[in-house]
Structure formats: structure tokens, C-alpha cells
A protein has these predicted regions:
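Beta-rich carbohydrate-recognition and catalytic domains
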Residues: 39-224, 236-283, 298, 306-351
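Predominantly extracellular/luminal regions of secreted and cell-surface proteins
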Residues: 185-197, 351-385
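Aromatic, loop-rich ligand-recognition surfaces of beta-strand-rich domains
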Residues: 387-453, 463-510, 518-519, 529, ...
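Solvent-exposed loop/turn segments flanking beta-strands in beta-repeat/beta-sandwich domains
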Residues: 435, 531-548
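Short beta-strand segments within Ig-like beta-sandwich modules, predominantly Fibronectin type-III
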Residues: 456-459, 551-557
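Conserved aromatic anchor
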Residues: 522-534
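Beta-strand-rich modules
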Residues: 562-583
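Extracellular fibronectin type III
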Residues: 579-593
């Protein structure tokens, strides 16, 4: 979690002010006694798919400008259910299936301190957040109740971005750090007290000269500034310790996670061959940094990540969940290909990303739009341009404002994602009346309309509402009519329609050419022929022909510069082509030394 840009000499003063501010903000929060949020869900119980960003009740921040945030997630499974802790959420989230989420409120935890860490040990959950020593460690055996007790009242380490790791032998370790100067650290803790034992070690620091993903900027284009290295997380797999970290900064589309590997929990750590492991620089919602890796009830690995909007404020962020794998050689990778399209939530052990694919394609990209009204700086086309950082806004938030998309072909519609944006909002924190009400309809002729989803009586906060249709419909037009917004205008960062259009998938793309920059080998330039009928392209690349784990989506264009390579690594590239009917995989793989 990137707090601010401070030289080392001001760190102590910063931490003191950070804590004072946290205490002040806590006094502003008026939450009920530690109970589930009493909002009635209207989500269909038959839902089996999801789409990023996760459709959580993201809390409005307590200071201006009015905006929502959640970041620095920590997910764990406790007694077969999921608990998700994230910065500035006014509580923590609970789910039985990773599809439907409830908010648990509590007065017992320091919810205004950034980057919460939570771990299960001996039948209890332990919690701590960033801050200045002495810090408190909290414990509960009943997280659903929201009741926590202080377990350790004087944890002695001042730090940001804590991470607890319990080894298979029961020993407890602590990783931390968030700096554009200092390294990440690790130390062993006494599992009976959570106090440090042994000697602190430095585990890694930036080498942005040769690791392009550590360079700042949306496209890793800024070399001169040191990155923020932060967000430690450790996973043990087949006897190896995978130390994950994030950089170069939470506000960038390039925000990602990379990994070092060791034979012991305190290292020494060596950079893994495949990096970054979690990377999503393009698409509707981007970045996949400051994450944690966990296993679901079936043994599948997942990576829950911070994703950027960062328009009203640098810390305007959302969360995404991505499937994660370890291959036969122990190489770890997070699958972010089509990472904001719908995917299946498994109910069994899986072995590849292909098992989660729905086959539903994006039908709404850059399609003709009609609206009831629009603001000059937020025109209607921004509802379908696949960019969460821009938005269409009606002139008001009144009942009856509407938007309609012409898909241009009568297509099979399987799902719709409604991504609201908080335009002209004044809301702060949590409170009554924070929910959306709407009517979603479809038509084949723009005259006769039928209901897709009726949420005119909804009282659930659904800022990124995802509607999976139990029975697909044939539609050419999709219309969304506003009945209520919490505050401000009726505004959408994206009205996204998924399914399949008639026709065939595009042909393979030809003449992929790749040129590596020998003066700065973290960079590579790609060009290819535009393919008729293609919506976009997916560049897959990696460290071997059978390890093309990276995914870079391109819409419309036929050229790309990637600046996130390891200067010392050989790479292999191919290109897939997609449209509203399907994906055509590239078969020619090009080696780049």
C-alpha cells in the first residue's frame, strides 16, 4: 500500500501524523454494533459466474472528494467460508461461495489503518494493520460476530503493509515494508505472543534497471523515479517459499505483483523466472498489484488484487480476483487473460484457466449509444469505450434518466455488467440510502421491450452489478433506466454486455513482428496486420513456448510497446485475435533473445 512520497528523514513524523489522522477518522465513523449489513440482496442464487471488478459495497471515503475505495486485500478461508479484509472498507466482507458477499461491521478493529493483515492460527483469526509501534494484534474465533479481542497490545515494529505467514511446522513469520528507498523485511514471530524473535533480514529491493515491471508509469515508461516496493505476501508450495511483492505504484495501470523463491522462509530469495506473476495493464479495469494468494475450499489457488481507477484520488481503487497456478516446474502464474470478462466460479478442483472460460464475448464495445441526456465533458460513448477511468453522465440523477445500446446485431446475451461512477457525489463513509435502483430491458427492434432485470426495489449497494441470465436471450438493444442513485448524477463507467454475436471468430493475425530494444532490453516493440472483423488482440508471451503466461490485451490498434520485461530473460510471443463471436488462438510462436 503506497501511502505517500516521503524521504527517509521524514518517516517518523509521517507515521505520527498517519496515526493521528487515523484516530480522527475513527471518531467520524458511526457504525452499528458488529453485525452483518442489513441490506436485502436481490442477486439470483443460481449465479455461477463473476466478472471483475468484484461487485462489493465499496465504501465511500471519509474525506473529499467523494469517492469509493478498497485496496490491499487479504482473503482467507476460515471454517469453510471466505473472509476478505481490505483497506478503508468500514468492516470486512464474508462469503460462502466467492460470489455473494456480505459486509460485517465492527467497532473492535482499526479499520482506518491501511493494509490489514489477517491469518488463521490454531483455530483463531489474528488481525493487524499498518501503523506506528506499539501496535495491537487482535484475535477472534467468531469472525461472523464482528467481536474481536486484543491479543497483543504492544507489537514493537513500526511498519506499513504487514503480512503474517504460518509455516507447515507451525512457526510464524512476518513480512513487511512499503518504500521507494528501503527494502522489504522479514522476521520470525513467537506464535504464542506474536512478538519478534530472531534477527530481521532484508529480503529484496528494486532493480528497476533490469526488471521493467518495477518502473513507474501506466506503461512502465518512467525510469528516473524509484518505484514503491510494497505489499509482501508469502505462499508455500511443494516445499518452496514464494515471496510476492508489488510495484511500481498503486495509481498506475502497470501496478503488478512479482515473486521471489527460496528454500527457507527467511531466504535467501532468488527472482523467479516468470515475472511479473500478476499483471493486467489493459482492459476495462487495469492493474493487479498488492494482492494475496489463497486456496479455496477445493484447493484451487486464487489471487485477490488491487485494481486502479485513480482519477478523483490516487487511492480510488477496486478489487479483482484471478485464478492462480503452479506449473510442473514450480513456476507460479496468475491468469489475467480476458480478466474482466465473465468467468466460472468452480465447485471442484481445476487444473487450467480454460476450465473457467464461459465463451461469452464482449458485445458492447464502441457500439452506438442513445441517452436521455449527457454532460458535455462526459458524453455517451464513454459508457462503452472499455475504460473504467472515464464515464458517461446524465445531466441529473433523476428517476427516468436512461441509456440504450445498439449491439448492431441480434445476439445471444448471457450477462450484463453495470459499472456505476460517483459523479458529483457528496457522500462520505457508510450510511443509509447507498444503493441503486434500475430497470434493465432488452429488445430486438427498439420498440418492444422486455425485462432483463428489475431492481426498482433494490436496497443492496451494487456499484459494479453483474447480472448473469439464467436463460440467455436474443437481443439487439439493451436499455438501462435509472430509478435511484445514492447521490449525484446517473453515471456509468461501463455498461458492458456479454454473450455471442452471430458469425465466426476472426482469422489468425498475420505478420507479427517483434523488435527488442537492445539499448534497454526491458522494452519490446510489436506490430501486426489488422484482421478484418476483429474487435481486438491478445498478446501472449512468456519464458518458454509452453509458458506463455502473460496476457496483454489490445483493442483496435495493431502496434504495442511492452516495457515490463526482464532484461536478462529470453521471451516467446504469439498473438490471438478475438471478436464478438470467439477467440482464434495464434499458432506461430516467435522467439526473442
Amino acid at each position: 500500500m503506497q501511502i505517500c512520497f516521503l524521504p527517509p528523514t521524514t518517516y517518523t513524523n509521517f507515521m505520527n501524523q498517519f496515526l493521528k489522522g487515523s484516530i480522527l477518522l475513527l471518531t467520524l465513523i458511526n457504525v452499528s454494533n458488529t453485525v452483518f449489513s442489513q441490506t436485502k440482496t436481490t442477486t439470483k442464487a443460481t449465479q455461477t459466474t463473476v466478472a471483475n471488478p468484484v461487485n462489493l459495497s465499496y465504501r465511500f471515503m471519509l474525506d473529499a472528494p467523494s469517492r469509493r475505495e478498497a485496496a490491499d486485500p487479504n482473503m482467507l478461508v476460515f471454517k469453510g467460508e471466505y473472509y476478505l479484509f481490505a483497506s478503508k472498507s468500514g468492516g470486512y466482507f464474508h462469503s460462502k461461495d466467492m460470489i455473494h458477499w456480505d459486509l460485517i461491521k465492527t467497532n473492535d478493529l482499526p479499520l482506518e489503518d491501511y493494509a490489514p493483515a489477517a491469518v488463521e492460527l490454531n483455530g483463531a483469526i489474528y488481525f493487524m494493520a499498518s501503523g506506528n509501534a506499539p501496535l495491537k494484534v487482535y484475535r477472534t474465533t467468531d469472525p461472523k460476530s464482528g467481536k474481536w479481542e486484543v491479543f497483543n497490545s504492544a507489537f514493537p515494529i513500526t511498519m506499513i503493509d504487514p503480512d503474517f505467514f504460518v509455516d507447515t511446522d507451525g512457526r510464524l513469520y512476518f513480512y513487511y515494508g512499503c518504500s521507494n528507498v528501503n527494502p522489504l523485511y522479514a522476521i520470525e514471530l513467537d506464535p504464542k505472543t506474536f512478538n519478534p524473535i530472531g534477527t530481521r533480514v532484508e529480503v529484496m529491493n528494486s532493480k528497476r534497471e533490469i526488471y521493467g515491471w518495477e518502473r513507474k508509469g501506466d506503461y512502465n515508461e518512467i525510469m528516473k523515479d524509484r518505484p514503491w516496493i510494497e505489499g509482501s505476501w508469502t505462499t508455500k508450495h511443494n516445499g518452496k517459499y514464494y515471496l510476492q511483492y508489488s510495484g511500481p505504484g498503486t495509481e498506475f495501470k502497470s501496478y503488478s505483483d512479482a515473486v521471489y523463491v527460496a528454500d527457507k522462509p527467511l531466504g535467501p530469495f532468488t527472482l523467479a523466472r516468470h515475472n511479473p506473476i500478476s499483471y493486467k495493464p489493459e482492459g476495462f479495469v487495469t492493474s493487479a498489484g498488492h494482492s494475496n494468494t489463497y486456496q479455496d475450499k477445493y484447493g484451487n489457488y486464487w489471487h485477490v488484487s488491487t485494481m486502479t481507477i485513480s482519477q478523483k484520488h490516487m487511492f480510488e481503487r477496486r478489487l479483482g480476483i484471478f485464478p492462480t497456478f503452479f506449473d510442473k516446474d514450480g513456476d507460479m502464474y496468475v491468469y489475467t487473460g480476458f480478466g474482466d470478462f465473465p468467468y466460472k466460479m468452480p465447485t471442484k478442483k481445476i487444473s487450467s484457466p480454460a476450465e473457467l472460460a464461459t465463451g461469452w464475448m464482449l458485445l458492447s464495445y464502441n457500439k452506438p449509444v442513445e441517452v436521455s441526456s449527457e454532460q458535455p465533458n462526459h458524453p455517451k460513448n464513454l459508457a462503452v469505450n472499455e475504460d473504467i477511468r472515464s464515464f458517461w453522465s446524465a445531466k441529473t440523477g433523476n428517476k427516468g434518466e436512461w441509456i440504450s445500446i445498439d449491439l448492431e446485431k441480434t445476439s445471444t446475451v448471457n450477462a450484463v455488467q453495470i459499472n456505476y461512477y460517483e459523479n458529483e457525489s457528496k457522500t462520505m463513509g457508510r450510511g443509509e440510502g447507498i444503493y441503486y435502483q434500475y430497470l434493465l430491458e432488452y429488445s430486438t427492434d427498439n420498440k418492444t421491450w422486455k425485462t432483463l432485470e428489475d431492481k426498482r426495489n433494490n436496497t443492496t449497494d451494487v456499484p459494479h452489478d453483474y447480472i448473469e441470465l439464467k436463460t440467455p436471450v436474443k437481443a439487439r438493444y439493451i436499455r438501462l433506466t435509472n430509478y435511484k442513485v445514492p447521490d449525484g448524477t446517473f453515471a456509468l463507467a461501463g455498461l458492458r454486455v456479454f454473450g455471442k454475436a452471430p458469425g465466426v471468430a476472426p482469422a489468425q493475425t498475420n505478420n507479427l513482428t517483434i523488435k527488442r530494444n537492445e539499448a534497454d532490453r526491458v522494452m519490446v516493440d510489436l506490430t501486426w496486420d489488422k484482421q478484418a472483423g476483429a474487435t481486438g488482440y491478445n498478446i501472449r508471451y512468456g519464458i518458454a513456448k509452453d509458458k506463455l503466461y502473460q496476457n496483454y490485451q489490445v483493442l483496435g490498434n495493431n502496434a504495442l510497446t511492452i516495457r515490463s520485461l526482464n532484461a536478462n530473460q529470453k521471451y516467446y510471443f504469439t498473438i490471438d485475435t478475438f471478436n464478438e463471436t470467439g477467440v482464434t488462438k495464434g499458432t506461430k510462436i516467435i522467439e526473442v533473445n
